UniProtKB/Swiss-Prot annotation:
It comes from Dendroaspis angusticeps (Eastern green mamba). One of its GO terms (molecular function) is toxin activity. CDD domains: TFP_snake_toxin (cd00206). It comes from the Eukaryota. It is found in: Secreted. One of its GO terms (cellular component) is extracellular region. SUPFAM superfamilies: Snake toxin-like. This is Muscarinic m1-toxin2. Expressed by the venom gland.
Length: 65
């Protein structure tokens, strides 16, 4: 499985997930109005959302763009 690690306009990067990590995730963390921090990567299980987080998990290559 290949997941997006960072998704900048010029240099999107991806990573091959290690054995046992069969999900890609993208986390939006609310900072202030119109400002969010994005975290992307591989996971064995879908991370739990914390305060003001939205998490999307998926199981296909680069599905967490």
């Amino acid at each position: 499985l290949t997941c997006v690690k960072s998704n900048s306009i010029w240099f999107p990067t991806s990573e091959d997930c290690p054995p046992g990590q069969n999900l890609c995730f993208k986390r939006w963390q609310y900072i202030s109005p119109r400002m969010y921090d994005f975290t992307r990567g591989c996971a064995a299980t879908c991370p739990k959302a914390e305060y003001r987080d939205v998490i999307n998990c998926c199981g296909t290559d680069k599905c967490n763009k």
